[in-house]
Amino acid sequence: MKGLFVTIEGPEGSGKTTLIQGLLPYFEQKEQKVMATREPGGIAISEDIRTILHKQEYTMMEARTEALLYAAARRQHLVEKVMPALNEDYLVLCDRFIDSSLAYQGYARGLGMDKVFEINRFATEDCMPSLTIYLDIEPEVGLARIAKDAGREVNRLDMEDISFHKRVREGYLQVVERFSDRIVLVNADQPMEKLIEEVIQVIEDKLL
């Protein structure tokens, strides 16, 4: 693979999607081949899996089922969209990847990070990001942002209680420590303009 694979991670309301939309024009005007995508989703099969995962009424979904569905969506998205783009020398900006599964299912759901990592090693064939930006934010702040965003559809994970979202952040911080060679922690509780500038600097310093 010749391209650069950058993933953006963070708890609910950390600003991942808005950040990526802010990064795109910067790299486009530099004539960098760049593509934005998301997980779960990005292509038809994975978007269908996303719909299942996010349905509010599916509160009975068991943790292993959830982990396996995310891994399945990840596999299809990787082979159908991400890998071809990397082979065409694109900078791929992806909203979530394997670290989400480690934090949400591995830690917050209690499945164990090592078990979830092995599921995803199988799904990705050890394809890992060139760089991961983790947007750190207190759960209360992130959830308050979501509550104010009238255009954002509330999904099944948003409906979890605050203790779950606190565990997600704890899980992420463990993931950051475990993969410190790949992950850069950035404070997401700042104006989006400043966040975009900081992340651009990180990407350019680390990769370009």
From Swiss-Prot:
Its EC number is 2.7.4.9. CDD domains: TMPK. It catalyses: dTMP + ATP = dTDP + ADP. One of its GO terms (molecular function) is ATP binding. Transmembrane segments: none annotated. It holds the Pfam family Thymidylate_kin. One of its GO terms (biological process) is dTTP biosynthetic process. It comes from the Bacteria. ATP binds at G10, P11, E12, G13, S14, G15, K16, T17. The keyword ATP-binding applies. One of its GO terms (cellular component) is cytosol. The keyword Glycoprotein does not apply. Keywords: ATP-binding, Kinase, Nucleotide biosynthesis, Nucleotide-binding, Transferase. Belongs to the thymidylate kinase family. Phosphorylation of dTMP to form dTDP in both de novo and salvage pathways of dTTP synthesis. This is Thymidylate kinase.
